[in-house]
A protein has these predicted regions:
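Histidine-rich, glycine-flanked metal-binding segment
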Residues: 1-5
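Divalent metal-dependent hydrolysis catalytic cores, especially in the metallo-beta-lactamase
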Residues: 10-12, 25-51, 66-78, 94-108, ...
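Short, glycine-rich nucleotide/cofactor-binding loops
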Residues: 14-18
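A generic structural signal for solvent-exposed, polar alpha-helical segments
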Residues: 19-21, 142
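Catalytic-loop motifs flanking and including active-site residues across diverse enzymes
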Residues: 21, 25, 225
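Generic structural signal for well-ordered alpha-helices
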Residues: 26, 49-60, 86, 119-123, ...
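N-terminal cationic-hydrophobic initiation segments that often serve targeting/anchoring roles
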Residues: 30, 56, 60-63, 90, ...
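Histidine/acidic residue-rich metal-binding segments in metalloenzymes
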Residues: 81-100, 108-230
Length: 230
């Protein structure tokens, strides 16, 4: 096989947000993608079956007429996530996956998890049920350099999760480092990569001044990391 034509791919990491932003983005996404995993970090995070159903309804209502686009909903994990809500939502096809945000790691993540090991019972249930875990893989400790947050997260948190739950379906989201590439290849997990991190290295943020348009979380890294991602 020399050529693979993907007629209508899936988007495995989509932020639709809310209101007018949602209505604008969904027009473009539904034109080019058949399905998408919808991130749950809205201003009021998607933490329950009812909130996921309501959010999905607003997405479907914003779709162009005759669109067959399918939004795949996720639940936002918190320190207080209800085990029954999580598993019932997955078994009844409300949730496609669960998303782990370390608290304050990125946009609308203030409700995220503050101590990941407190979710180990949740992870065990997810492993047993086959529910995927999607992870924003960065620590938020103030003493850790912003460019090292992914690597430290892998060593401190993800390595422990993969050892304790070897059959848990894990996706390390939007990886940015060669360290993450190596970890994914050496372990039974998947990863997503953004076009942004394939296209630029961290120099782009500072070349000729401060270029805020190139800033995102996780931040872009050195050129050797960009090449490893490619």
């Amino acid at each position: 096989l020399k050529t693979l034509n993907i007629i209508k791919p899936d988007d495995w990491h989509l932020h639709l947000r809310e209101g007018l932003v949602l209505k604008n983005i969904i027009q473009f996404t539904s034109e080019y993608f058949g399905r998408a995993i919808v991130m749950p970090n809205t201003k009021s995070p998607i933490t329950s079956i009812n909130s996921a159903i309501s959010y999905r309804k607003s997405i479907v209502e914003a779709l162009p007429e005759s669109s067959k686009f399918e939004p795949l909903m996720t639940i936002y994990l918190t320190d207080d996530t209800d085990k029954g809500e999580l598993i019932n939502g997955f078994k009844n096809n409300v949730f496609f996956a669960a998303k782990l945000y370390p608290a304050n790691a990125t946009t609308n993540s203030s409700h995220g998890v503050r101590k990941i090991e407190n979710l180990y019972k949740i992870f065990e249930l997810m492993q047993d049920s086959g529910m995927p875990l999607l992870i924003h893989g960065e620590v938020t400790d103030s003493e850790v350099d912003v460019f090292d947050r992914e690597e430290v997260f892998i060593d401190k948190e993800l390595s422990q999760i993969t050892k304790r739950f070897p059959k848990l379906k894990i996706v390390l989201e939007h990886i940015t480092t060669s360290y993450a590439v190596d970890f994914v290849q050496e372990n039974n997990i998947g990863a997503t990569i953004t076009p942004h991190h394939l296209h630029i290295n961290r120099n782009a943020m500072f070349f000729g001044g401060l270029n805020s348009d190139f800033y995102c979380l996780p931040v872009a890294k050195r050129e050797n990391n960009r090449l490893a991602l490619r």
